[in-house]
Design a protein with these regions (language model features):
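C-terminal subdomain of the subtilisin-like protease fold in secreted/lumenal serine endopeptidases
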Residues: 215-219, 359-400
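Extracellular S/T/G-rich loop segment that most often corresponds to the catalytic His/Ser-adjacent loop
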Residues: 119, 267-355
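Gly/Ser-rich catalytic serine loop of serine hydrolases
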Residues: 143-156, 338-348
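Short glycine/serine- and small hydrophobic-enriched flexible loop segments
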Residues: 163-164, 204-205, 351-359
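Substrate-binding/access-modulating region of protease and related hydrolase catalytic domains
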Residues: 188-271, 339-341, 345-347, 385-386
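Solvent-exposed loop/turn segments at secondary-structure junctions
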Residues: 85-87, 121-123, 189-191, 224-227, ...
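Autoinhibitory propeptides
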Residues: 1-13, 25-28, 35-104, 388
Length: 400
């Protein structure tokens, strides 16, 4: 039994030893026979939640007794707590509103390219639903509703940066790739918090459906604080699968202070593009709460983009899209736009830029995209570990 208990994460083992909870939401990693483990859990009184096929993982709510019983199975390699992820932006009241739109004569618009997004959902904002349908698919992992909604607001805001058409601002607050599509997965609740297992499931779903919707970019506008090796290796495995499927994953550097080596979680992986935040009000400087590198020998963030007082789409966070299976329609918004600050804004901007690059050349790889972005950046007058290769020059990027 002692050797078997080594399969338990140390925090989970301690909680079980001290009888802290009646049940434990856990992630179970299997070496093989995932379906057999799923069947075993469903046979009992415990609560099976989901299976993440690409990562050979199962999420479930189990009693301590069930955990100690199931861990004896040789096909199980590890059981750990299901941790949390957190969104990387906050609403701000500001008279200064920064638009991230590109020039009126810009050649590309993201046409034919879909951006997968894991966030708090997407409100059916007119800037996303008129002219062309911006939300190509909506999936609600939190509550299982069929129709788009957003009870936090971040997902709608990020969607607007990527592909809002600016129809209610005469184009002033148009997104970067207004002809692209959004596959929106709601994994975050109204407080901006998500179980990591739900995030894994969302990423796995986007990869599996990427061919059907031509998903070329996955935007993950959130962070995790854990350095748990299993969780990070699972993110890395999913990111590698995305790369092999022709998809680029874009993430924010995070919300820690911009002190040396403050980046945490998957933002430090070399299988994603990590975007730091800039304060562009007055002299451009690193945003105070933009997590910084370096990460060992790896340069992170990869590049930086504006993230302070960004203006994008507002949402009615009280709107619920259905009742008893029937679709409900939202009331007209009093204000179509709002301002937010945070590195998720910077990640959304770069996600939109990646959509434009894929419209230009759909065969580009992860390494191609990263090289093109880095070669088109300009270093700013502060430490490289805060900015990566610097601020992106979009004119230079698309000049060739």
């Amino acid at each position: 039994m002692f050797s078997v208990r080594k399969k338990l994460d140390s925090s989970l083992k301690s909680a079980i030893d001290n009888d802290r909870f009646k049940s434990y939401r856990v992630i179970i990693h299997c070496n093989a026979l995932v379906d057999a483990v799923e069947h075993k859990i469903k046979q009992g009184k415990d609560n099976f939640i989901c299976k993440i096929e690409e990562a050979n993982c199962i999420c479930a709510n189990l009693s301590a007794q069930s955990i100690l019983k199931i861990i004896e199975k040789p096909e199980i390699s590890l059981i750990t707590f299901d941790d949390f992820a957190y969104l990387c932006s906050s609403n701000v009241v500001s008279k200064n509103k920064v638009s991230l739109k590109l020039g009126e004569s810009f050649k590309y618009s993201g046409k034919g390219v879909c951006v997968g997004m894991v966030d708090s959902g997407t409100f059916p904002h007119p800037d996303l639903m008129t002219r062309t349908k911006g939300i190509v698919k909506f999936l609600d992992i939190v509550s299982g509703l069929k129709y788009p909604y957003d009870d936090n607001g971040d997902g709608t805001f990020v969607s607007g940066i990527i592909r809002g058409n600016g129809s209610n601002s005469k184009g002033m607050y148009r997104g970067v790739a207004p002809s692209s599509g959004i596959y929106s997965i709601k994994a975050f609740n109204s407080l901006g918090k998500a179980y990591i297992s739900n995030v894994f499931l969302a990423i796995d779903t986007l990869i599996n459906e990427s061919k059907e919707f031509n998903i070329k970019v996955i935007c993950l506008p959130f962070e995790i604080s854990t350095e748990d090796n299993f969780i990070l290796s699972t993110f890395n495995k999913l990111f590698e699968k995305a790369i092999s499927s022709g998809i680029v994953v874009v993430v924010p550097s995070g919300t820690n202070e911009n002190t040396r080596s403050s980046i945490r979680g998957f933002a430090a992986l070399d299988t994603c593009i990590t975007v730091g935040g800039l304060n562009t009000e007055g002299k451009i400087k690193s945003y105070t709460y933009s997590s910084s590198g370096p990460c060992g020998k790896l340069t992170k963030p990869d590049l930086s983009a504006p993230c302070v007082n960004i203006c994008s789409l507002n949402s009615d966070t009280n709107y619920i899209s259905e009742r008893n299976g029937s679709k409900l329609y939202p009331n007209k918004l009093n204000n179509y736009y709002t301002t937010c600050t945070g590195t998720s804004c910077a990640a959304a901007y770069v996600s939109g830029i990646c959509a434009l690059l894929f419209e230009k050349d759909n065969s580009l790889t992860f390494k191609d995209i990263l090289s093109l972005l880095n070669a088109s950046c300009t270093l700013l007058n502060f430490p490289k570990w805060q900015q990566g290769e610097g601020i992106l020059d979009v004119t230079k990027l698309f000049s060739s």
